[in-house]
Amino acid sequence: QLIKLWKDYISEGSFQDPTSPYWSFENMKVPDENFWAIGINTLNNRGYKVQCKIIGVFEVENGYWSLISSFSHLDKDSGEIHLDVISAVYAKKINDKYLLISSAEYLKTVFEHHKVGNINYYVHPFHKFKIEEAERMQEFNVKMAKEFGVEPLEFDYFVARNARDLARTWGYEYMNRMYNPTGKGGIARWRNMTIYSGNNSSDYPHELVHLYTYHVVPKEPHLWIGEGIATFFGGKTDY
């Protein structure tokens, strides 16, 4: 039943569909948002075939199940097999029906949690949470609210020590961005009001500015404009 659920989602190719029958929308508006690296919506119309192989299905904590899948393709020119990603998705029975759950949503139930002002922190087990960083982030949150003329935003903040740990909160056991040269990284997801930090810090003003710009003008800005505003108010990321 779980395998069929995942296979049907992959086969249909409807990525980030707000009416998807496969996902739970109980706590996330776009539960499959972080699966952009798989390219769900293009799997069936690429110039090459992508093989999806389920390599593990097992029960985890709090009534959830985990499904691990590899996505790979054959390079026609070199004859080499390329591993694209190894993904982790979760499932849970809700109202007598299994639905897919994002990795981030599942990890909310098992990660260390701290509420600091308007921010819900979810802490990767390899990261040591520092309350002073979180308080500084909340102060910046209040400052940005005044700057943009809105109420302080309430959002989730996943904090990990590096990009490798962070990618696993997105739902990847493997993806090439886990191994970027700096070992750090992060991103703001405005539709789910979530910041993912792989810079070993609970203070990430640059990404918070992105949440505010998206909140005030709810659409994707041009990259240069969005990054320019975030850098102006929140400083550069250095990675």
Sequence positions of predicted segments:
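A short hydrophobic beta-strand element
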Residues: 60-73
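Extracytoplasmic
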Residues: 62-64, 84-86, 107-109, 116, ...
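Post-HExxH zinc-binding segment in Zn-dependent metallohydrolases
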Residues: 51, 220-239
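Juxtacatalytic substrate-recognition/specificity segment
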Residues: 111-222
